[in-house]
Amino acid sequence: MQVSVETTQGLGRRVTITIAADSIETAVKSELVNVAKKVRIDGFRKGKVPMNIVAQRYGASVRQDVLGDLMSRHFIDAIIKEKINPAGAPNYVPGEYKPGEDFTYAVEFEVYPEIELKDLETIEVEKPIVEVTDADVDMMLDTLRKQQATWKEKDGAADAEDRVTIDFTGSVDGEEFEGGKASDFVLAMGQGRMIPGFEDGIKGHKAGEEFTIDVTFPEDYHAENLKGKAAKFAINLKKVEERELPELTEDFIKRFGVEDGSVEGLRAEVRKNMERELKGAVRNRVKSQAIEGLVKANDIDVPAALIDSEIDVLRRQAAQRFGGNEKQALELPRELFEEQAKRRVVVGLLLGEVIRTNELKADEERVKGLIEEMASAYEDPKEVIEFYSKNKELMDNMRNVALEEQAVEAVLAKAKVTEKETTFNELMNQQA
């Protein structure tokens, strides 16, 4: 076997391989012998068909199959010999085959980039230092009460957290615009659903009033014809409602799985959940900075084949989220996913190199801890832990999570890490 390797462009490679004629003929004869043992031809007993007849009838197809098999096997031998690491499926380019002559063909493919991690010491990471305070727990209890609140109609003016029912008609330069009109529209104030200034214009008005508010659409508004435009909205305020928050009664508290129904028990459960959420948020915040720094410090070429493969994964995930099928997934424009796919491939390659250079393996104690932490959010943690322990795929996924965490820690060990005190709300708002 003769092999030559050339770089076509970037990560592209072209391997040219020549297979000796006698190797081909030996393989063809061997396969024809196997065929002769199995075929049935009228006038001959099974296994007794003369080889010249077998060759005459099956020679062309056997030769084609043998060539395909030899091309594949010789390519594998070639990349092992040349220490080449292909990324994605190879493209075979057959040459012209002439019986009795050597056969030359080419294989085109991309290789993984050679990565030499650099400048890890320049990566800057700010680690949030946060404690869950009594005030944070109070705020979370208020949020829980608001989620369970009922609405009661009131006579007074609309406030920042009231709910209003309105009719409205919007216009720009005196002309109504598409999507700018609604009847019996229910708006819970304070949630940021409307454009800036809209809710402020409603505050202070009472049910039964009709009025006009002036607003300006943001420059980044989704409708091109409305970006940055001044608009007027004619409002008919039909109803104003205020929240009625439930008291922290025993029955109310038991809805959240606190068996004794006590306020102290609810506060303890809320604090535990907040601390678990906080731990994950700090971990994600630090991880995202470390990965961002790793990517910025190491500019690498990415095989197009890996990006294409990742785009297909993202397409299928998107289709599943919206109830689509395989065919619909592949019809989604690749441009929607290309940037995200490239980013995921780059991160995967760089973290893979961190794992390789540091000879990391998944720490089983860490895997166990991750599963226990995740299971603690469920009603029966033991059942969840047992379910994971019996499912190889889930365990492998969790090992990958642990290994990625270990890789991030290896990056952090060389990075410049500073600590910054912050509050629970500030950190959670950054995560949103």
UniProtKB/Swiss-Prot annotation:
Molecular function per GO: peptidyl-prolyl cis-trans isomerase activity; protein folding chaperone; ribosome binding
Alphabetical list of InterPro entries matching this protein: PPIase_dom_sf (IPR046357), PPIase_FKBP_dom (IPR001179), Trig_fac (IPR005215), Trigger_fac_C (IPR008880), Trigger_fac_C_sf (IPR037041), Trigger_fac_ribosome-bd_bac (IPR008881), Trigger_fac_ribosome-bd_sf (IPR036611), Trigger_fact/SurA_dom_sf (IPR027304)
GO terms classed as biological process: 'de novo' cotranslational protein folding; cell division; chaperone-mediated protein folding; protein transport; protein unfolding
EC primary class: isomerase
Predominant localisation class: cytoplasm
One Pfam family in the UniProt entry: Trigger_C
The keyword Membrane is assigned to this record: no
Keywords recorded for this protein, A-Z: Cell cycle, Cell division, Chaperone, Cytoplasm, Isomerase, Rotamase
Recorded superkingdom: Bacteria
Locations listed in the record: Cytoplasm
EC number of this enzyme: 5.2.1.8
GO CC terms, sorted: cytoplasm
Domain PPIase FKBP-type: 161-246
Chemical reaction(s) catalysed: [protein]-peptidylproline (omega=180) = [protein]-peptidylproline (omega=0)
Subunit structure as annotated in this protein's UniProt entry: Homodimer and monomer. In vivo most of the ribosomes are in complex with monomeric TF. Uncomplexed TF, however, is in a monomer-dimer equilibrium with approximately two thirds of TF existing in a dimeric state.
PANTHER family hit by this protein: TRIGGER FACTOR CHAPERONE AND PEPTIDYL-PROLYL CIS/TRANS ISOMERASE (PTHR30560), TRIGGER FACTOR-LIKE PROTEIN TIG, CHLOROPLASTIC (PTHR30560:SF3)
UniProt cross-references to HAMAP family, sorted A to Z: Trigger_factor_Tig
Family to which the UniProt record says this protein belongs: Belongs to the FKBP-type PPIase family. Tig subfamily.
Task performed by this protein: Involved in protein export. Acts as a chaperone by maintaining the newly synthesized protein in an open conformation. Functions as a peptidyl-prolyl cis-trans isomerase.
Domain notes for this protein: Consists of 3 domains; the N-terminus binds the ribosome, the middle domain has PPIase activity, while the C-terminus has intrinsic chaperone activity on its own.
Protein name as annotated: Trigger factor
Species per Swiss-Prot/TrEMBL record: Escherichia fergusonii (strain ATCC 35469 / DSM 13698 / CCUG 18766 / IAM 14443 / JCM 21226 / LMG 7866 / NBRC 102419 / NCTC 12128 / CDC 0568-73)
Gene name per UniProt: tig
